[in-house]
Amino acid sequence: MKRLYLVRHAQSEYNEKGIFQGRLDSDLTPLGFVQARLLAREFLKKKVDIIYSSPQRRAYKTALTISDMLGTQLVVDERLREMSFGEYEGKHFWSMLEAHKDVFLNWLSNPVKHPLPTQESMEEFEKRVRSFLEDVKSSHYQNMLIVAHGGTLHAIVCLLTGIGLENLWNIHMDNAGITEIHMEGEKSTLVYLNKLCHTRQLT
């Protein structure tokens, strides 16, 4: 059995400001660095054979903090980048929702049927995420930690559990949230979603 730990990056500067990020590359906030250290402490309790990270700073610095504390190999994989939102990147989410309400509500309800006009195509997005998952399935590692972004990690959950990318935004993961999936052959089981108990001291 393979055990996958999916971790959404710690809080970034654009998260704090409510800005749509996608491929933009904002750094962690001071709170984000604290969250990353709390994640690292949490994973000291678990067996982790390898860490995979998106190359984007908010994910990479989260992963690097964990890797440094665990002494575990960190591998950067381009396929874990966040999906591109085109011309919507760098804009405030709520102002866009107000200006383009129907477009955004349709996209949130079913991004396959109603993609954003300028985003990375769902076909391209699915192809790169599936490519990564095929490598995960064939890997000799049994306990893998994957640090990436909301859209990318939601896609991994959708594809492994078979619920389809039309449910991409029906999943919620907070900054520094942990999700665990077990893989046995072609069967995947969602053990828990968006675990946050390691960050309780921040509330």
UniProtKB/Swiss-Prot annotation:
Enzyme superclass (EC): hydrolase
Quaternary structure and partners: Heterodimer with PspA. The PspB subunit appears to have no or considerably lower PSP activity compared with that of PspA.
UniProt entry keywords in alphabetical sequence: Amino-acid biosynthesis, Hydrolase, Serine biosynthesis
GO CC annotation: cytoplasm
Regulation: Activity is not inhibited by EDTA in vitro, nor enhanced by the addition of Mg(2+).
Pathway this chain belongs to: Amino-acid biosynthesis; L-serine biosynthesis; L-serine from 3-phospho-D-glycerate: step 3/3
Disulfide pairings: none
Functional description taken from the UniProt entry: Part of a complex that catalyzes the dephosphorylation of L-phosphoserine to serine and inorganic phosphate. Is poorly or not active toward D-phosphoserine, DL-phosphothreonine, 3-phosphoglycerate, para-nitrophenylphosphate, and fructose-6-phosphate. Does not display phosphoglycerate mutase activity.
Protein name: Putative phosphoserine phosphatase 2
